[in-house]
């Protein structure tokens, strides 16, 4: 009853060894595991009887030097360290499952992981062979990685559309086979009649909006004057499971041309090279650092407001940024304050970012961004 439990603040691990002796033969196996109780109480995520808030970003299998994810723990230690430096406690593996090393490190440092099957499809269920492969893959993932305490959340895939009856059947099978995780049908969907409220079997709900309104700044910042006394509570009123905001941000930063020499492996930065060539032709190459800083500072302000909006909202259980680092997997998406190598672009330090993204964040509500000297500031 008094055994230490695993969480982000106390990632306590145990080793269990089993030895089988038969005549002159001996077999020994050791399993590392953690004890934790994760569930939801209404719209709150609860870990070991305490509410948790996910401060997350995506990992979209972005490894520019190799094109494949690393299988050594040192590489994952570096990646997780960068995420934690910027206040994160959660990674969503977007439409893929990482290798064993990623789970081992997450276990050791206390990171909450969301895994997905390798699918991002607008025709889910149309091809029966694909569905059967994914069913089998779910069983393999559960068998190989399911006992890791960091493996807290599981979704079938990203923005899935088409046959929600098959999705429901598949999620039911996954939940019945393995109750060590919390499950969601899909990380958001554009399917008509879905995506704005949880599916019946969802333990948590990942979305951009609900049937009552937006839960990320995309539908707010472009429509309203800056204000700091609002939140998304009207949009989640009546929500009965925890809500995590989907792919928050996507604020572009000008290319950091000093990044070009870093690409020494499988990926060539042709987009960066084209921008550099264009600036040189126009005699503007000296302006590139200024463009980076100006666009980056705006992106940082917007990310800050996104995060604080979520933190201010009772009933929101976390956010998943797109992205803390750049996303070169879908054209050019320089949406990160870190580059594709999880390295700083010099826009905002981790210490500065943690001022608004951390386990404890002071928040203030006030109605506008600009005041004159003859006004009284009330908050």
Language-model-derived ranges and their functions:
Residues 81, 90-339:
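Substrate-binding/catalytic cleft of secreted carbohydrate-active enzymes
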């Amino acid at each position: 009853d008094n055994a230490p439990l695993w969480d982000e603040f106390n990632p306590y691990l145990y080793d269990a060894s089993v030895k089988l002796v038969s005549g002159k033969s001996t077999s020994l196996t050791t399993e590392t595991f953690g004890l934790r109780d994760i569930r939801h109480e209404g719209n709150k995520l609860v870990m070991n009887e305490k509410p948790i808030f996910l401060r997350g970003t995506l990992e979209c299998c972005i490894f520019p030097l190799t094109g494949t994810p690393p299988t050594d723990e040192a590489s994952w230690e570096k990646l997780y360290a960068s995420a934690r430096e910027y206040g994160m406690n959660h990674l969503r593996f977007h439409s893929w499952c990482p290798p064993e090393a990623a789970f081992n490190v997450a276990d050791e440092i206390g990171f909450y992981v969301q895994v997905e099957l390798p699918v991002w499809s607008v025709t889910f269920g149309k091809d029966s062979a694909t569905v059967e492969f994914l069913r089998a893959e779910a069983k393999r993932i559960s068998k190989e990685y399911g006992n890791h305490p960091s493996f807290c959340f599981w979704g079938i895939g990203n923005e899935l559309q088409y046959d929600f009856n098959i999705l429901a059947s598949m999620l039911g099978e996954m939940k019945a086979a393995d109750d060590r995780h919390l499950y969601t049908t899909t990380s958001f969907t554009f399917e008509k009649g879905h995506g704005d409220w949880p599916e019946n079997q969802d333990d948590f709900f990942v979305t951009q909006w609900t049937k009552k309104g937006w839960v990320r700044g995309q539908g707010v910042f472009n429509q309203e004057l800056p204000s700091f006394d609002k939140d998304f509570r009207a949009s989640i009123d009546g929500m009965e499971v925890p809500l995590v905001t989907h792919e928050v941000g996507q604020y572009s930063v000008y290319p950091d041309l000093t990044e070009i020499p870093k690409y020494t492996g499988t990926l060539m930065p042709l987009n960066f090279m084209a921008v550099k060539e264009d600036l040189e032709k126009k005699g503007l190459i000296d302006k590139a650092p200024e463009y980076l800083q100006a666009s980056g500072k705006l992106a940082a302000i917007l990310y800050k407001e996104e995060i604080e909006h979520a933190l201010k909202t009772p009933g929101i259980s976390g956010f998943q940024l797109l992205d803390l680092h750049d996303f070169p997997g879908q054209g050019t998406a320089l949406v990160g304050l870190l580059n594709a190598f999880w390295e700083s672009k010099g826009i905002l330090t981790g210490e500065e970012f943690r001022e608004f993204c951390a386990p404890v964040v002071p928040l203030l509500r006030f109605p506008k961004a600009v005041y004159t000297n003859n006004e009284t500031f009330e908050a």
